């Protein structure tokens, strides 16, 4: 069984990352310890709580974000600082425009990157510690929250034969959920395992790129960017959907992707209503550790419109926000997730465990923001969340 002993005796760095010129917050910046696989990310307001073992207090604390210089400071210099605000500088590297000597176009860059996936991503078994969250919203009101601490085991990044069958094996450490998971509105959401669906959104792991030549010829190369001391190719596609891919120069590793589609698509009919897919937004980010790129975080937002079957009028909207943050990576792992510990393929709300407050108090989650406080306000109409976690 998985040990939770490592959750005890941790030290915490809390703060906010901002642009050093504009003072604007830096959302989804990667927080970490140099040379270690432990990490978290900032929220929409650039805020973070980072729980780390005390033996890391003499190591270097780091913040990385696309287009910015890497921020580094000894951990011990940040401990105990009230209202810690860290100003991160934009990259001062002079980046050439698209017309540069290497002459590669967007399609060629991505084709090389895809061909090098097995060089740049793990090809030996590995384990990841992760934090999963899904939030459901109906007609503008948040109705449910589920969070889980998970272990994820995978063999490698070899291209799967079936790109729609989960290759990773997931073990649940802790699960907590709000009362809203028993709401009548939950039937308007997919009742399957939503974490399994989220992992299948990893376009690099599951090679979701079209094979047709027209896809590659439609890609446009944008101005280069900068990340963690390296120049980055930026490739985009703007057609019926938007796609943006960041590829590290030299290794051709895909380090970050953004995808958005707003095309309406018929889905299903239920209780005198018909549903149409309205929006999908996906962000995938990778982090380098010991020469290989591992999943850092994945966010997926989706929206479905529900119409009256007879009048065709919009009745309400359902929205689902899913996030998976990887807290720590264990390369070349000899550990496995036993069949008895494996997550089942039905909804996580039916696999919840007794609430463990001490565990969650010391676990790296995505820090709540003002937006999250609106979520909490909606959910607590049925009682304090802490009480809901205990009773569900």
Q: Where on the chain are the PLM-derived regions?
A:
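Structural motif
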Residues: 9-26
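Short Pro-Gly-centered beta-turn/loop motif in secreted/extracellular proteins
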Residues: 23, 50-58
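Hydrophobic beta-strand segments
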Residues: 29-33, 46, 61, 100
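Short, acidic Ser/Thr/Gly-rich low-complexity loop/linker segments typical of extracellular
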Residues: 37-47
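Short strand-edge motifs at loop-to-beta-strand transitions and within beta-strands
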Residues: 48-50, 82-84
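A short, solvent-exposed loop/turn motif at the edges and junctions
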Residues: 62-73
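Surface-exposed, low-complexity/disordered segments
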Residues: 85-218, 225-230, 276-392
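Extended beta-strand-rich segments in extracellular/periplasmic secretory proteins, especially
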Residues: 206-259
């Amino acid at each position: 069984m998985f040990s939770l002993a490592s959750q005890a005796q941790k030290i915490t760095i809390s703060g906010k990352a901002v642009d050093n010129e504009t003072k604007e917050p830096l959302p989804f910046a990667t927080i970490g310890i140099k040379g270690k696989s432990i990490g978290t990310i900032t929220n929409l307001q650039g805020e973070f709580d980072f729980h780390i073992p005390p033996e890391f207090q003499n190591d270097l604390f780091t913040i990385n974000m696309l287009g910015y210089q890497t921020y580094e400071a000894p951990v011990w210099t940040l401990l105990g600082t009230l209202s810690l605000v860290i100003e991160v500088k934009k990259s001062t590297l002079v980046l050439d425009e698209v017309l540069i000597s290497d002459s590669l176009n967007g399609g060629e860059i991505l084709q090389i990157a895809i061909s090098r996936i097995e060089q740049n991503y793990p090809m030996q078994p590995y384990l990841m510690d992760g934090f999963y969250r899904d939030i459901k919203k109906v007609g503008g009101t948040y109705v449910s929250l589920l969070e889980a601490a998970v272990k994820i085991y995978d063999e490698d990044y070899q291209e799967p034969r079936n790109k729609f069958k989960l290759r990773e094996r997931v073990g649940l450490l802790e699960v907590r959920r709000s009362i809203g998971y028993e709401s009548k509105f939950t039937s308007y959401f997919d009742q399957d395992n939503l974490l399994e669906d989220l992992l299948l959104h990893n376009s690099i792991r599951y090679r979701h790129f079209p094979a047709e030549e027209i896809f590659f010829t439609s890609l446009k190369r944008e101005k280069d960017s900068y990340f963690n001391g390296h120049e980055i190719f930026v490739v985009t596609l703007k057609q019926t959907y938007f796609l943006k891919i960041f590829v590290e120069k030299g290794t051709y590793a895909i380090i970050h992707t953004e995808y958005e589609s707003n095309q309406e698509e018929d889905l299903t009919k239920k209780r005198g209503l018909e549903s149409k897919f309205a929006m999908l937004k996906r962000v995938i980010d990778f982090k380098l550790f010991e020469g290989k790129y591992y999943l850092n975080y994945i966010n997926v937002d989706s929206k479905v419109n529900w119409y009256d079957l007879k009048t065709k009028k919009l009745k309400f909207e359902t929205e689902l926000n899913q996030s998976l943050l990887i807290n720590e990576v264990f390369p070349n792992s000899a550990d496995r997730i036993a069949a008895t510990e494996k997550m089942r393929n039905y909804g996580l709300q039916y696999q919840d465990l007794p609430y463990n407050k001490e565990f969650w108090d010391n676990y790296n989650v995505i820090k709540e923001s003002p937006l999250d406080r609106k979520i909490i306000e909606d959910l607590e109409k049925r009682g304090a969340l802490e009480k809901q976690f205990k009773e569900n």
